[in-house]
Amino acid sequence: MNIVEVKNKYCDSTIWNSVSPRKTDVVIASCYKSGTTLTQQIVNLLLNGNSDLRGYKSIHELSPWVEYNPDPTFASLELKLNHIENLPESRFLKTHLPFDALPYNPETKYIYLVRDGRDVALSLYNAGGGYDTSLYEEEKVEETFPEFWDNWLETGRHLWPLWENILSWWRVRHLPNVLLVHYANLIGDKPKEVERMAELLGVKMDAAKKDLVLEESSLEYMTENWEKFQSPGFLPKRFFGKGKNGRWKDLLPQEKIEKYEVFIVDKLGIECANWVKNGGYLPGLIQKALDDAIEEAMTPD
């Protein structure tokens, strides 16, 4: 059962209690706007070896956002739960919940995506221009980004606060079945991140498969095949942004940036805040890479 419950106009965390866990399940998680759909496609390619989506029309049918309710992809919650129950092995399910709002299963593999809050906010702001307002009229964004920023930083508008979500997953980063992935690493060194995901999932990957994963998870491929990946509730071809970080530097005044620097440390603590802002690899992961390098160097040719 969930330790905490999250219920709002988009989500009901208790829906997860109706999903029977499997030993092979994978859960892809983020707060939002942190590379979730990209990671769904990477995991799809690692597990299934192609972009056919096992015959489904979109990644959101093959990898449903479980707690999303009502979900435009499905006619009813009952149909959605039946769909999830009948998904083929290995299932990879999506969530935007904090860790403690999920029913934890030690056999499930969890991948959590993190991104600098300034990039998250700008991506969310830009997404506001792509919503289908017949579904989400109240999410239409009309103010400037600096105006949007002030409200979002404190409240998480239009969705929910980023900080509690990140912190809940940060606290379990040492669990062997939990992998934290920073978006800056994912777009800056995708081959390495793909290898880390493959290792977590127990997927053996030769050069040909790795090339396939990298090619068919590229922004170019996913934009060209947008029908497979566009999230429900967006206008056609309006879901994907530029996929770049740091564009907020030209939009936020210095005083707001300085306030963010203090705010994020207060919310997350120094170590977590530094990682969220800068990316890079966490100490435990760095040590493992070092151990692997030493072992390789000591292995006779």
Feature-to-residue mapping (PLM):
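PAPS-dependent sulfotransferase catalytic domain
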Residues: 1-181, 191, 227, 231-234, ...
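Substrate-binding strand-loop-helix patch
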Residues: 186-188
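Short, well-structured alpha-helical segments
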Residues: 207-214
